[in-house]
From Swiss-Prot:
Keyword S-adenosyl-L-methionine: yes
Pfam families: FtsJ (PF01728)
Cellular component aspect of the GO annotation: cytoplasm
Chief place where the protein resides: cytoplasm
Name recorded for this polypeptide: Ribosomal RNA large subunit methyltransferase E
Alphabetized GO MF terms: rRNA (uridine-2'-O-)-methyltransferase activity
Catalytic residues in the record: K183 (proton acceptor)
PANTHER family membership: RIBOSOMAL RNA METHYLTRANSFERASE, RRNA METHYLTRANSFERASE 2, MITOCHONDRIAL
Native organism taxonomy: Bacteria, Pseudomonadati, Pseudomonadota, Alphaproteobacteria, Rickettsiales
Length: 227
């Protein structure tokens, strides 16, 4: 099971304050050092703890199978692309599997992944992805989130806007019966988006993986079987 953390829960690590380190950065470092999923990701060879969120989503909904075409939006540092590559048994020589990953930040190569280093919101990016797909996608997935500022309402709206744009893109490239996965932050303004998604997909679920931090308002929108 992805949430088996036996052996990864270490003693609490304290972080000393420093004149060169802000309070927020000290808190982030303390959280990272004491997060068992961070340690597990390091041991399992994943680039981020977010990999376990996608693994849990797959365990719940059984989305990934071999011979799929997948788009990973906001892919850096590549944890979700790594998981997708493993689940569909992708390789650089298997043309039946295709993962197109996009981010403005560079990521190291992942087997079976074609990386597009572009800002998703630039005018020509969608066309580049569509050309790289050479067909329609089975899954569009997005773990994109805006840089949080600690104001929950603002963080909620900003990440919701990213999800909306990912959804509009998914409608253009998904094949019938394709799936859409995206992060949102709960906050009340998501209802209109959920209404739109439910019109386009047969089944729409909310899911909060156990690997998602308990204090976080993030949940994942899992939209199954595009109409």
């Amino acid at each position: 099971m992805t949430n088996n953390l036996s052996g990864y829960r270490n003693k609490f690590v304290r972080v000393k304050t420093s004149k060169k380190r802000t309070v927020s950065s000290s808190n982030w470092l303390r959280r990272q050092l004491n997060d068992p999923y961070v340690a597990k990701a390091r041991m399992d060879g994943f680039r981020s703890r977010a990999a376990y969120k996608l693994l849990e989503i797959h365990e719940k909904f059984k989305l990934f199978t071999p011979n799929m075409k997948i788009v990973d939006l906001g892919a850096a540092p590549g944890g979700w692309s790594q998981v997708a590559s493993k689940l569909i048994k992708a390789s650089d020589n298997n043309l039946n599997n295709k993962i197109i990953s996009i981010d403005v930040l560079e990521i190291e190569h992942v087997a079976g992944v074609e990386f597009v280093q572009k800002d998703f919101f630039e005018a020509d990016t969608e066309e580049l992805i569509i050309q790289a797909l050479d067909g329609r996608a089975d899954i569009v997935m997005s773990d994109m989130a805006s840089n949080t500022i600690g104001h929950k309402a603002t963080d909620h709206i900003r990440t919701l806007l990213l999800c909306e744009q990912a959804f509009e893109f998914a409608l253009k490239v998904l094949k019938p019966s394709g799936h859409f996965i995206a992060k949102i932050f709960r906050g009340g303004a998501e209802n209109e988006l959920l209404y739109k998604v439910k019109r386009e997909f047969k089944t729409v679920k909310h899911f909060k993986p156990s690997s998602s931090r308990s204090e976080s308002t993030e949940i994942y929108l899992v939209a199954l079987n595009k109409k």
